[in-house]
């Protein structure tokens, strides 16, 4: 079974296709017929040691102080402070609609996210993995997305949609890590 997580990179972002979600897959009683079972494998080294570092955990949540509508398919969210973290998106939209959540610390003169101060050394080979930009494909139902494999530095989030969509300050929350 394909995962809804279709790409992840700790340095850039996560791409998520909500159309591939399987309700209850992580709960007891889920019918996993056709799934492969976990298999025991050899250790990659003789001694396995845990990482000696503090865990990355949620420490605070922030609601947007402003959700500025740029046009029918683009919004810019302003959060009260610059954080290291992720955003939690809760939205319902047309099935197959692609949202891009571009996280940054600055705005340009037009009020759009400017990443000139943080993507200085980023050299992509194509447009498939934009820097600090989560990509979410909507299922047509009520969708919830929060990245599990990365975090970003940001105070502003530019949400652009492949089709017109209605968003408000309640659709996106900043989660500090």
Segments the model singles out, each with a brief description of its role:
Residues 1-177:
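Extracellular/oxidizing-compartment recognition motifs
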